[in-house]
Amino acid sequence: MANIVFKLSDKDITTLMSRITFDTENLPQGMKARAKYQNTTVNIYQSGKVMFQGNHAEAVSKELLPQHSQLNTNKTKKKNMANSFLEQTLMYDQFNCIGSDEAGSGDYFGPLTVCAAFVTKEHVPILKTLGVDDSKKLTDTKIVELAEQLVTFIPHSLLTLHNEKYNIQQAKGWTQVKMKAVLHNEAIKNVLEKIDSSQLDYIVIDQFAKREVYNHYALSDIPLPKKTKFETKGESKSLAIAVASIISRYAFVTYMDQISKNINMTIPKGAGAKVDVIAAKIIKKYGLSHLDTISKKHFKNREKAQKILKPL
């Protein structure tokens, strides 16, 4: 299945929407309109990007957007291929892969989120055109923009371990490594249920522990051990991991924004001194018990925040 993406102006989008009938209701977040035309799906996103999906995507795009040359898209792809990130991803991107990654493990506030995503060889050109990259290099705004598009066509499983459950498991003796191993394994199994596993070449996990440690903590066997690889700095080696990273980061960022709105304070990410100050303010205004519902209790920030309040 071919995938073609264009970045259009508001005027061009209006013109496109006048040419065929689009649905504008009950759409995924981040999508403006969707249409089915000549066995091709046309998705218009709030970001201004338009995606054509289907075996006739190129022909339909030329018909509906005659003013846009596919040559420009090809030039963009060649430029993207030249950058270092895409050169590094070449090995895994020649195969159909499930990638998995997590977000929030180093942050005092917010949950632990894990995503597994299935990226095929056919997905690779569109992901490069969209600008999928290592999430650590992307702003939160860009992560939200990308994730809201990715979830509409990439088979994936997103799991969130909220703070209250996280703290319960940690009190039982679960380390972060065990939590991540369990969540990664479950997310991968969930994706395998959504796809034809005979089409899968590799499962690539962004390595947070060696294989034997992962196996020890995962509670269940790795689904396809012979196809499973562990990669350090996996986001720079596999687009499947990069996609999983973006979606898991999106879930974490969205949750953090919601916490900030709920308590009317801007909640900082990470576990630095700014976090200590905000945690102290939350204790003073809402109490320690409320702080524990939105944070990871075993982090040193909790103790530091309490010390900040002692002189007051």
Curated annotation (Swiss-Prot):
Any GO BP annotation: DNA replication, removal of RNA primer
The keyword Ribonucleoprotein is annotated on this UniProt entry: no
Disulphide-bridged cysteine pairs: none
Subcellular location: Cytoplasm
Record field: catalytic activity: Endonucleolytic cleavage to 5'-phosphomonoester
Keywords attached to this entry: Cytoplasm, Endonuclease, Hydrolase, Magnesium, Metal-binding, Nuclease
Domain named RNase H type-2: residues: 95-311
Gene3D superfamilies linked: Ribonuclease H-like superfamily/Ribonuclease H, TATA-Binding Protein
EC number: 3.1.26.4
Protein residues bound to a divalent metal cation: D101, E102, D206
Cofactor note as given: Manganese or magnesium. Binds 1 divalent metal ion per monomer in the absence of substrate. May bind a second metal ion after substrate binding.
Entry's Gene Ontology molecular function annotations: magnesium ion binding; RNA binding; RNA-DNA hybrid ribonuclease activity
Family annotation (SUPFAM superfamilies): Ribonuclease H-like (SSF53098)
GO cellular component, one term: ribonuclease H2 complex
PANTHER family xref list: RIBONUCLEASE (PTHR10954:SF23), RIBONUCLEASE H2 SUBUNIT A (PTHR10954)
Membership in a protein family: Belongs to the RNase HII family. RnhC subfamily.
NCBIfam families associated with the record: rnhC
Function according to Swiss-Prot or TrEMBL: Endonuclease that specifically degrades the RNA of RNA-DNA hybrids.
Protein name stated in the entry: Ribonuclease HIII
Organism for this UniProt entry: Staphylococcus aureus (strain MW2)
